[in-house]
Amino acid sequence: MIDAEQLRRVSVKVSSETAGLLRDLACSEDLGRVVSGETTVADKRAEDYILDLLRRELGQVQVISEEAGGVASKTSDAPIALVDPLDGSTNYLSCITWCSVSVAFADPRSGEILAGSVAPVYAGMPVSFARGKGCYHGGLKVEDPSIRGSIISVYVDEPGAIESVAGAIGRLKGVRRDFKVRSLGSAALELAYTAIGYIAVFADLRARLRNIDVAAAVGAVRECGGVVTDAHGQPLRIGVWRVERVGSVVASLDEALARIAVGGGSG
């Protein structure tokens, strides 16, 4: 099994090069055409590119993604790659520059997420991590990450989500009146920026996120010393052997803020 740091480097290379491809293709008319289900030409082009890069870099790899699907074997020595080729596709297809590419690697036997990278398609550097080896912003290791932003990142585009998020916002603003609320359109990128402190609290209470959407970013938050929970304040569990929902996600570098967001602390 390849070590976590090598896998981090591969995840950075693959996510960054795919982000470059998407940047070069941006705003082309044909990219929004649906090829199957909810998969567009842009999704398919990016995923095919990722699959080719992964095979060139690693040889044997078990890929779990929306288009390719897949069920990984627990007895294989090949690492599992959880891939989201384009998070924030609505933004991307609308020529809005907030979207990202996510690649995470997991141990097929234990299910432990070992490494990953979230690369912005447009401005900014990838956020990456290797389990037990630290987290990185671009090529620099993030030392003692702490919250420096005042943004609460939320998602409310599902029935009931507005009410749930409103409670979280009210509790958090009771702690810090200067918190600002934003909903930007790429959950993976917002989680990644939570890992390095640019976003103070991430709260997606729609119960619709999948493992491929957040595996890399959740790993980064945890490696940077933050916490990631479900809507009940329990540590978020992420399966890695097939595409599956992980539900609602709350994250912060400050455990107290995450607890307040889900109603388990006082403000």
UniProtKB/Swiss-Prot annotation:
Q: Tell me its EC number(s), please.
A: 3.1.3.25
Lineage: superkingdom = Archaea
Which InterPro entries did the record assign? Inositol_monophosphatase-like
Keyword tRNA processing tagged = no
Instruction: List the GO molecular function terms.
Output: inositol monophosphate 1-phosphatase activity; metal ion binding
Which cofactors does the annotated protein need, by name?
Mg(2+)
Keyword S-adenosyl-L-methionine found: no
Q: Which Pfam families match?
A: Inositol_P
Q: Where does substrate bind?
A: E66, L86, D87, G88, S89, R182, D213
Residues where Mg(2+) 2 binds: D84, D87, D213
List residues binding Mg(2+) 1.
E66, D84, L86
Q: Which reaction does it catalyse?
A: a myo-inositol phosphate + H2O = myo-inositol + phosphate
Q: Where are the transmembrane segments?
A: none
Task: For this UniProt record, give its keywords in alphabetical order, as a comma-separated list.
Answer: Hydrolase, Magnesium, Metal-binding
Family, as annotated: Belongs to the inositol monophosphatase superfamily.
Concerning PANTHER family, the annotation shows: INOSITOL MONOPHOSPHATASE, INOSITOL-1-MONOPHOSPHATASE-RELATED
Put simply, this protein is called Inositol-1-monophosphatase
Origin species, per record, is Aeropyrum pernix (strain ATCC 700893 / DSM 11879 / JCM 9820 / NBRC 100138 / K1)
- Lineage of the species this protein comes from: Archaea, Thermoproteota, Thermoprotei, Desulfurococcales, Desulfurococcaceae
